[in-house]
A protein has these predicted regions:
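A polyanion-binding, active-site-adjacent surface
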Residues: 2-218
Length: 218
């Protein structure tokens, strides 16, 4: 059994079908922004007091990964473990995300950058307020400007609705290419949701295949 088949089986996706990929063509990697362009942004995020979330956070969760990535994954807001560790998508949800990436031939930190709409954890994991989103959005936009991803994957209802300024359900947003900040965007379920709703893992695999095909056509 191939590694991808093993990963898909671990995700609970059956039957396992083969993902067709085009032969990889080696091209020179584009040079990203100088490292010093990230320094003021990271400092601005870590010291941000623009909304009340700075009073209850343990630390900010800036984002992690390849700063020259083609793929950018955007989640909702940090949870308790993310707030404690300072990294997005950790714990069980993070392990599931790693399996999801492996299923389409990707891995965390290699041509993938992961961030959240919000950089601070809302108390009790409540949904962020419009004011909190408005204050934090410039940080995310600056990350996108520096990374210049070719494709964004919005993970979860809140992230998708916020980025697309829509109140539509994930079901109605899936399977289409949207745009955010000029970048093609695809919507799928959040890994934490999939831990509670196993039957939607197969739909997420469909989204990942669609994302891979979309990236191949860019």
């Amino acid at each position: 059994m191939s590694r991808r088949a093993v990963v898909l089986a671990e995700m609970g996706i059956k039957p396992v079908w083969k993902l067709r990929t085009k032969p990889r063509v080696e091209t020179p990697s584009p040079s990203g922004p100088p490292a010093n362009e990230w320094i003021p942004l990271k400092a601005a995020v870590s010291g941000c007091t623009k909304c009340g979330l700075h009073k209850t956070r343990t630390q900010t969760v800036f984002g992690v990964g390849d700063e020259n990535a083609d793929w950018m994954l955007i989640g909702e807001a940090p949870g308790a473990e993310e707030d404690r560790l300072g990294d997005p998508f950790v714990g069980q949800a993070g392990r599931l995300l790693d399996n999801m990436l492996a299923a389409i031939g990707l891995s965390r930190g290699k041509n993938v950058y992961i961030a959240n709409v919000l950089k601070c954890r809302p108390p009790g994991n409540r949904n962020p307020t419009p004011e909190e989103v408005a204050q934090c959005s410039p940080h995310l936009l600056k990350q996108i400007e520096l990374i210049k991803p070719r494709l964004i994957v919005a993970m979860g209802r809140f992230a998708a609705q916020t980025l697309l300024e829509s109140d539509s359900s994930i079901a109605s947003l899936r399977g289409r290419v949207h745009r955010y900040a000029g970048v093609p965007l695809i919507v799928t379920y959040h890994p934490a949701y999939l831990l509670r709703t196993l039957e939607d893992k197969a739909k997420t695999w469909e989204d990942l295949v669609f994302a891979r095909k979309t990236m191949a056509g860019l």
